[in-house]
């Protein structure tokens, strides 16, 4: 069975799924977040993993932390499902699973991007505390679906080629 859509469709979907449960000053998608996460990452060979880290949201959605805990309390391990989908994605793309160092770099980049989103993108910030990570110097601005879609597809091709050229292929 194939649980993931073709990668082009998955990237298109990321361009359409809003972050922050729609609590936004302007349309801002998981695709834009994915591009920023990859850009923030210091290791060029690891950027494909950061770029694709939110692909499971195409299948399971992008629930907030409260929903994740509620689901877990009721027998649905969303994070576990996301990990499984990422494992399938790495196999599909002939990528080695990310190392612990790559996973940590994705986490650091994601936290930095989320802190910047809090400053630039989130509409009502009164309901919570700003993420503790440092923010980017650049301001996040609105970009159209077509722009994000094209940038995601180009970044995917570029980052996958770099990862494969560096030897980050799945062991057979």
Kindly give the residue locations of the regions a language model identified.
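Metal-dependent phosphohydrolase cores
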Residues: 1-172
